[in-house]
A protein has these predicted regions:
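Non-catalytic signal-transmission and effector/linker regions of two-component phosphorelay proteins
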Residues: 1-11, 109-120
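The feature encodes the CheY-like receiver
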Residues: 65
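Acidic catalytic/metal-coordinating carboxylates
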Residues: 42-45, 68-71
Length: 120
């Protein structure tokens, strides 16, 4: 089974305040067959998107304006309990308790193998 057929129905919400990073993440996810249901620059925008679409994955930056990753994750756990939250940060050096997985931004090439661990 290929990665594309495995992930074809999986959805992802991308939350990062850097537009270029969101764009790269979108391209990466879509190239692997994931459906990007939305992008948000902060947690305040992300929460209603997640509530509406119930994504399989939320790629969530830690340092966000208005509502940071930790605060957003707390709300997301309540409104989208089945969503897997991936902390995606340049400043965290280990997995925070609020995330299902952690990936440093300088290791972006490891994102898809990480997401595949949840798909199997």
């Amino acid at each position: 089974m290929t990665a594309e057929t495995t992930t074809a129905t999986k959805t992802v919400l991308i939350v990062d305040d850097d537009e270029e990073i969101r764009h790269v993440l979108r391209l990466l996810c879509e190239s692997e067959g994931l459906e990007v249901i939305g992008e948000a620059a902060n947690g305040v925008v992300a929460v209603p998107m997640a509530l509406k679409h119930q994504p399989d994955f939320v790629i969530l930056d830690f340092m966000l304006p208005r509502l940071d990753g930790e605060g957003a994750a707390e709300i997301l756990r309540a409104v989208t309990p089945k969503s897997k939250i991936v902390a995606f940060s340049a400043i965290l050096d280990s997995q925070p308790v609020w995330a299902d997985a952690y990936l440093n931004k300088d290791r972006i090439t490891e994102l898809m193998p990480l997401l595949r661990t949840f798909i199997r």
